Design a protein with these regions (language model features):
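N-terminal export leaders
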Residues: 9-10
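Sec-dependent signal peptide hydrophobic core
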Residues: 13-20
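C-terminal motif of bacterial Sec signal peptides marking the signal peptidase cleavage site
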Residues: 24-27
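Bacterial lipoprotein signal-peptidase II cleavage site
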Residues: 29-36
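Tryptophan-anchored aromatic micro-motifs
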Residues: 36-69
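Edge beta-strand at a domain terminus
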Residues: 38, 260, 269-328
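N-terminal glycine/threonine-rich, aromatic-flanked beta-hairpin/loop signature
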Residues: 52-53, 62-239
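Mature extracytoplasmic/lumenal regions of exported proteins
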Residues: 224-289, 293
Length: 328
């Protein structure tokens, strides 16, 4: 997995020696400098209430240079958070980067994830259309010619092998299959047009919630979670949906006739950009969540970390009387 040094990361971002305006984290009153320098454990409401950048990773792992980052979260200091999907980012890649630079790198990762998901949907849908269109064309030609060659009757194919009294049913089956498959092809082509038109958009910052659970007494914290809307991409993706990808054989087309055509139940999303609720339990593992990677120190909760200064006191839960959080 490729690692980025500070110099190569800055070059990748096109920053060079120029200080970027970025997201306005540095020097503002709502910045996370107090969080980074804390001499006492920082409760969650303060940690996320200030503008800052946090990395989501596998909480069963200890932070290390090769540990993958799943998402980067940007808290705006006003109760909102934006989530960026990461394809190939590790803690080692963040060495020496500022919060602004991390978010810019995460944006590039998020756009790469969007492009990969879009291409996968385009490829799958195109494969399905390319498989089903010739199948439809063949069945339509057989119906137009009145031969119905794909119908099987005890191993023999063609309308002439079907008893006279059953032929009306064969014709009806053919027509139903053609109608269903044409509708499915029309939907697939519309879905493919949706995919092609989709263009990347940076995720929006949305409100997050801190939920605290109390112990049996109701007076002390027993657990706390960060709940937010995780951005996700939605594309139309059609699948061939038959046991064999070869739709050119009589036997396969006969099975299609029995199933009344292409059962394409894929739906066109309202938007390529959606979200799903995600909850991260702010728990501490048996090992320390403060870890130095190269020249950068990370601290936080299990599965959720931010850049801190060396000697940081760590992070903790809120108390039940903390304002602005949900309790039980």
């Amino acid at each position: 997995m490729k690692q980025y040094t500070r110099r190569s990361a800055l070059k990748l971002l096109g920053i060079g020696t120029v200080t970027i305006a970025g997201f306005g984290l540095a020097g503002c009153s709502g910045s996370g400098e107090g969080v980074k320098n804390a001499s006492e454990p920082v409760p969650a409401s303060q940690a996320f209430g200030q503008a800052g950048v946090w990395m989501v990773y596998d909480g069963d792992k200890q932070i290390g240079k090769d540990v993958a980052i799943e998402e980067v979260l940007f808290f705006d200091g006003n109760g909102n958070v934006a989530s960026y999907q990461c394809e190939s980012l590790t803690f080692g890649d963040l060495d020496g980067l500022s919060d602004d630079e991390i978010v810019e790198l995460a944006k590039q990762q998020d756009e790469a994830a969007f492009n990969a998901a879009k291409q996968a949907a385009l490829d799958a849908t195109d494969e399905a259309i390319q498989a089903w269109q010739p199948c439809y064309d063949t069945l339509k030609a057989e119906a137009d010619a009145g031969t119905y060659d794909s119908i099987g009757y005890y191993g023999d194919y063609g309308i002439e092998n079907v008893p006279e009294e059953d032929r009306a049913q064969v014709v009806e089956t053919y027509q139903t299959t053609l109608d269903n498959t044409q509708d499915a092809l029309d939907a697939a082509n519309k879905g493919q047009a949706f995919n092609k038109a989709a263009a990347y958009q940076e995720p929006e910052a949305k409100p997050y919630t801190l939920r605290l659970e109390t112990d049996g007494s109701g007076n002390a914290a027993a657990n706390e979670s960060l709940v937010f809307q995780l951005a996700k991409f939605s594309f139309y993706q059609a699948n061939i949906n038959v046991d064999e990808n070869d739709l050119t054989s009589d036997r396969t087309r006969f099975r299609i006739l029995v199933d009344y055509g292409w059962d394409n139940n894929a739906e066109i999303p309202d938007s390529a950009f959606g979200s799903t609720k995600k909850s991260i339990e702010l728990c501490s593992p048996t090992y320390s969540t403060t870890q130095t990677v190269y020249g950068t120190t990370f601290g936080g909760y299990s599965g959720l970390a931010t850049v801190v200064n060396e000697g940081h006191a760590g992070f903790t839960w809120d108390t039940p009387d903390t304002e602005g959080i949900e309790v039980d």
